[in-house]
């Protein structure tokens, strides 16, 4: 019947209600079905579209809560049909989860998060974060005001803290980027600490370059790591340094002028 709908009316639109007449003309029986108003909402303008979207949002949230997901304020949570949530996930207010995102049990999301195509492993915490195409490992801690871009992987127990942006970067288990840093095109080993205001300088104006930082490294605050670069295991960089050459394992690199008073 749907393929026989015409537009010969004053609005020039296809009317779904015309299906009843078409079915009867084809010899089919037509009977009444009792349903809710929500199931037969019409969408003719943006206001009605928003109402239909809100009804679907509420239905999806109800289904997940019945499956064991905790939502502190479900009226502020938006979850795509394509999202996978385990039981025992906790979602705080003002959270949007979309695309192929997967949230594993024990994870805490929110408040104020937007996650798209993001995997959050068991018992991880994500606060006030925008994440696109990232993988957040078990027990990892993200936020607040963190931006995870495609290709970002956080290992188990890793931390990406306040005002941190990461792109195409692999942060090893128990490594930390606590605050105010940009990490782009990088691989970082386990147990490494990236000091505040560190920048991975990955772009030379034409191409992006990779930085490799080993395990148990200490990057001093306000360090500029100019890629391509390799920093060995257990190395240190002094605060305020501009590092342009590889740093051997266990070494201390200082790339700044001496203070003069």
Located regions from the model:
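Glycine-rich hexapeptide-repeat left-handed beta-helix
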Residues: 117-261
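Long, charged amphipathic helices and adjacent flexible linkers at domain junctions
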Residues: 53-82
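Catalytic-core segments of class I nucleotidyltransferases/pyrophosphorylases
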Residues: 1-57
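Residue-level recognition of oxygen-bearing side chains
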Residues: 15, 48, 84, 230, ...
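Phosphate-binding active sites in nucleotide-utilizing proteins
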Residues: 77-118, 122-123, 129
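Short coil/turn connectors at secondary-structure junctions
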Residues: 26-28, 37, 86, 189, ...
């Amino acid at each position: 019947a749907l393929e026989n709908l015409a537009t010969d009316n004053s609005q020039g639109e296809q009317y779904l209600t015309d299906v009843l007449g078409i079915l009867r003309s084809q010899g089919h029986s037509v009977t009444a079905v009792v349903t809710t108003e929500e199931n037969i909402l019409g969408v003719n303008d943006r206001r009605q579209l928003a109402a239909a979207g809100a009804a679907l949002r509420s239905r999806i949230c109800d289904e997940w809560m019945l499956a064991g997901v905790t939502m502190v304020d479900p009226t502020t949570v938006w979850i795509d049909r394509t999202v996978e949530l385990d039981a025992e996930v906790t979602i705080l207010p003002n959270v949007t989860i979309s695309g192929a995102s997967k949230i594993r049990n024990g994870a805490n999301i929110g408040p104020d998060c937007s996650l798209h195509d993001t995997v959050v492993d068991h018992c991880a915490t994500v606060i006030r974060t925008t994440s696109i195409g990232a993988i957040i490992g078990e027990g990892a801690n993200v936020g607040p005001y963190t931006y995870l871009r495609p290709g970002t992987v956080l290992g188990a127990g890793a931390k990406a803290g306040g005002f941190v942006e990461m792109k195409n970067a692999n942060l090893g288990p128990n490594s930390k980027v606590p605050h105010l840093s940009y990490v782009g095109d990088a691989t970082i080993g386990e147990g490494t600490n990236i000091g505040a205001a560190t920048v991975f300088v990955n772009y030379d104006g034409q191409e992006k370059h990779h930085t490799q930082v080993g395990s148990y490294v200490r990057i001093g605050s306000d360090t500029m790591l100019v890629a391509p670069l390799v920093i060995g295991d257990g190395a240190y960089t002094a605060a305020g340094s501009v590092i342009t050459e590889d740093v051997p394992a266990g070494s201390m690199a200082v790339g700044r002028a001496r203070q003069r008073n």
